[in-house]
Amino acid sequence: MAKVLYRVDGPDGASFRVRDNSGVTEISLDSGTTWVAENQISALALATSFVVTTDAATYTVTAANSGKTHIIPNLTADCVLSLPTAAAGLNYRFIYGGNAADAQDWQFNSGSDTNFFIGGLVQHDPDNAGDDTVVYHPDGDSNSKINILTPDGGTWVEFYCDGTNWYVNASVISATDAAVTFADQ
């Protein structure tokens, strides 16, 4: 027989319970009609900790996916990735998930020059004996677009929003000279 170990009732009427069902820890949310084993919850958490973006000319990043890694596949066309409306606490990580250097470009767009980028990106260019490293910075007052040209394996970009502006930190691997550019709307 299952034994309820914990029960927590939230202020809005939502509740969850934890029980021991013959040595298996299970969790139930709200009504308690569906019990989920602890190992299933761990698998679910892993499955939802990342998003694979679509191979399309545009991709809308949602606030609901804040905190998740977005895997960008080898694209068949340049892609504009539109960040959500600025809100404090939003954060995203984007990584390149292709098997070879992408022939396409990424553009991250905040949607407004008032929601400009702060921070910087480093580019490593592997085709000149691997000795080309350049750091890029936005202008700090209006650059609301970041273009990343032909990313390769190891490329990642992180964004953190303070409610108005987007802080960016990134490492771009690309054999394209000047593979990072900034622009206004």
List PLM regions with ranges:
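Structured beta-strand segments within beta-sheet-rich domains
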Residues: 131-155
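Tryptophan-centered short beta-strand motifs
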Residues: 2-3, 35, 165-167
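Short, intrinsically disordered N-terminal pre-domain segments
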Residues: 1-22, 183-185
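Short, hydrophobic/aromatic-rich segments at coil-to-beta transitions
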Residues: 5, 66-70, 143
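Residues that act as N-cap/strand-start positions at coil-to-secondary-structure junctions
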Residues: 2, 12, 75-77, 153
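Exposed extracellular interaction/assembly regions and N-terminal maturation sites
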Residues: 39-133, 160-185
